[in-house]
From Swiss-Prot, chains A, B:
One Pfam short name: Tyr_Deacylase
Motif (Gly-cisPro motif, important for rejection of L-amino acids): 140-141
Function, in words: An aminoacyl-tRNA editing enzyme that deacylates mischarged D-aminoacyl-tRNAs. Also deacylates mischarged glycyl-tRNA(Ala), protecting cells against glycine mischarging by AlaRS. Acts via tRNA-based rather than protein-based catalysis; rejects L-amino acids rather than detecting D-amino acids in the active site. By recycling D-aminoacyl-tRNA to D-amino acids and free tRNA molecules, this enzyme counteracts the toxicity associated with the formation of D-aminoacyl-tRNA entities in vivo and helps enforce protein L-homochirality.
EC number: 3.1.1.96
Keywords tagged on the record: Cytoplasm, Hydrolase, RNA-binding, tRNA-binding
Family per record: Belongs to the DTD family.
Cystines in this chain: none
Keyword Nuclease: no
Domain notes: A Gly-cisPro motif from one monomer fits into the active site of the other monomer to allow specific chiral rejection of L-amino acids.
Name by which UniProt lists this protein: D-aminoacyl-tRNA deacylase
Length: 150, 150
């Protein structure tokens, strides 16, 4: 399982012409589920995201506070392309990306764990499998890669 | 060296209140340089980005055309946080991230290779080391992680 976390001041997902979800300050998460991922991968990375100290303290010292300590929100979007292998050739190889119902099930469990930790109203979702336009403002920028196998 | 590529319909970098760079359709690249990276890593990933078939063909089949074949642009931003190790604890460990002049030099060489391949006017940059607001619209979304050590 891989996650690209971007620290945002705002982020939204639009499908067609409808804004389906939006947050103010917090994390935009792009989430890739792999063919060999299980509940323990979901467990590991949901804990990691909720406890990750991605925010400064009041004195401006970095990496001090986590998402709930700054009353932040999370916008989560499923992104199988994160599991691409790119070392050979010019086309991405997606054999390690879990797809369809299996991916959606694990992704749903990941969302449930984030909501359990942060509160339902603080965790937004894209539309699994839809063509989405993800608008965001990455402040810093701050972008962190999490990998459950690392 | 790590790159997070996001396929965008627009992207810009603002420092303070000034928009310092912006592109329309193409790639937003967040680029992390590691302490053990050399020119060969720069060479490898610049070739990979320029030849990567991230775009559909006219019939809508995916992964067929590269950035120059679709007359796309690249907005590149230095992002040392991509080299963070996150497996232990709740704070990112940046010991593997190259910093300062050494990072800036390799990053500059990476930019030069992209420009040589795509044309100077098609490759934009952030401001190395500055606090930047990176606005983007990731279409799909499509996000790919490239790692020169993979």
């Amino acid at each position: 399982m891989r996650i690209v976390l971007q620290k945002v001041s705002e982020a939204s997902v639009t499908v067609g012409s409808a804004v389906v979800s939006q947050i103010k300050h917090g994390y935009m998460l792009l989430v890739g589920i792999g063919t060999d991922d299980k509940l323990e991968d979901i467990d590991k990375l949901s804990k990691k995201i909720l406890t990750f100290r991605g925010f400064d303290d009041d004195a401006g010292y970095g990496w001090k506070r986590n998402i709930s300590e700054v009353d932040g929100e999370i916008l989560c979007v499923s992104q199988f392309t994160l599991m691409a292998r790119t070392s050979k050739g010019t086309k991405p190889d997606f054999h390690l990306a879990q797809r369809g119902e299996l991916a959606n099930e694990l992704y749903g469990q990941f969302m449930d764990k984030l909501k359990a930790g942060l509160g339902d109203d603080k965790v937004q979702n894209g539309v699994f499998g839809a063509m989405m336009s993800c608008k965001l403002t990455n402040e810093g920028p701050v972008t962190i890669i999490f990998d459950s196998k690392a």
